[in-house]
Amino acid sequence: MVNHTATHLLHQSLKDVLGSHVNQAGSLVHPEYLRFDITHPNKISSTELDDIELIVNQKIGENITVDTSIKSLEEAKKEGATALFGEKYGDNVRVVTIGEFSKELCGGTHVSSTGKISKFKIKHDKAISSGIRRIHAITSNHVDLYLKEKSDELGLLKEAEKKKEVEKQSQSILLNSVDIDSIIEYPIMDFDGIELLFSKVELGDASDLK
C-alpha cells in the first residue's frame, strides 16, 4: 500500500519537473521497493532527480488524505484524472485522489494519508529502451537502511584512503631518514659488458627495512 501511494506521488512529481509529456509506461509495486517506467526522451539529471524526490517528500510531510471513490469514466476524465494510455476501462472507474496534487484511475490499495509513507528516496534511474526510463525508489524504513549502508561504505572508503595516506607518509619519513652523506659509492664494475654501480646505504634501524 505504501509504495503504491508513493508511486502516485512520484508520477505527478515527474510531470511537474520533467513536463506533461511524461506518461506511465509500466510499474512494479513491491513491499520493499517500487519501480516506475516513464516516457521521457532524455537522461534525467541529478538536479531533476533531487527536485522530484523533494516534491514527493514534501507531499509526504503534508500528510495529505488519500481519497478513493467510484465515478463514471466520463466524470473522472472531466475532473482531470490521469488514465493509463492504451488501458481499457469500464463505464465506472475507481479514482484515487491525493488532495489537489494527484488524481488517477487506479484499482489498487493505498494508505489513508501520505504521512504513512514516512520517507521517499530515488535510488537510481536508467534507460531501458528508446524514450523509456526506469526509476527505482524506496520508502519508509528501507530509506534508513539504504542510507546506513551508503554511510558504512563511505566510512570504509575513507578508512582505506586514510590508511593509504599513512603508508605514504611513512615511506616519505623513511626516505627522508636516509642520510645522503652515509651513501658510500663503489667503483663501477663490468660484468660481461654490463656496467654495474654498487652502493651501500646505512640506515638507522633494522626496522627501516620493513
List the model feature ranges, each with a label.
Residues 1-38:
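Active/ligand-binding-proximal structured segments within catalytic/core domains
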Residues 9-17, 51-62, 138, 142, ...:
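Generic, well-ordered alpha-helical scaffold segments in large soluble proteins
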Residues 37-39, 197-198:
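Short glycine-rich or small-residue beta-strand-to-loop segments that form or flank ligand, phosphate
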Residues 21, 117-210:
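Terminal appendage regions of diverse proteins
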